[in-house]
Design a protein with these regions (language model features):
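Acidic, proline/glycine-enriched N-terminal capping motif
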Residues: 1-134
């Protein structure tokens, strides 16, 4: 699957704000726009409820961006569009970095890993009356 647009890094995606005298993190306008763009482009597949692996090719506008800064944003977007149940179930990420000044994007594949926990989670959600995609 391909998602077009420059992935904001974690460090550029959040800003510190003060709420009732305490510091907190808030999403930047750039990150909010990227999440909305990701959701519009994402083609729905069955939701992965347990462990998974991801292969991702990241095409940045320049060589200045780094891979590790984009993983949180990418996994959070997958969770937000309900491609995955929770990013904590990510067991492996295989990533490659490229530069494409004119067409920044993500190209990725998500694989469910074979585990019995997967079926346990599905059955638990069904028992709780939650909708589960098959």
């Amino acid at each position: 699957m391909t998602i077009y647009g420059q992935v904001p890094s974690k460090s550029n995606g959040y800003r510190i704000i003060t709420i009732r005298g305490h510091g907190s993190l808030a999403k930047t306008k750039e990150l909010k726009e990227y999440e909305a763009n990701f959701a519009l482009q994402y083609k729905r597949h069955n939701k992965i409820l347990g462990n998974f692996e991801v292969e991702v090719d990241v095409y940045f506008r320049s060589n200045r961006s780094d891979l590790d800064g984009m993983f949180k944003v990418f996994l959070d977007c997958l969770q937000k569009v309900e491609a995955i149940d929770n990013d904590r179930y990510c067991m492996k990420i295989t990533a490659r970095k490229f530069v494409d000044k004119l067409n920044p994007r993500l190209e990725f594949k998500i694989y469910e890993t074979g585990n019995t926990e997967q079926e346990d989670i599905r059955e638990k959600k069904k028992g709780e009356g939650k909708e589960v995609e098959e």
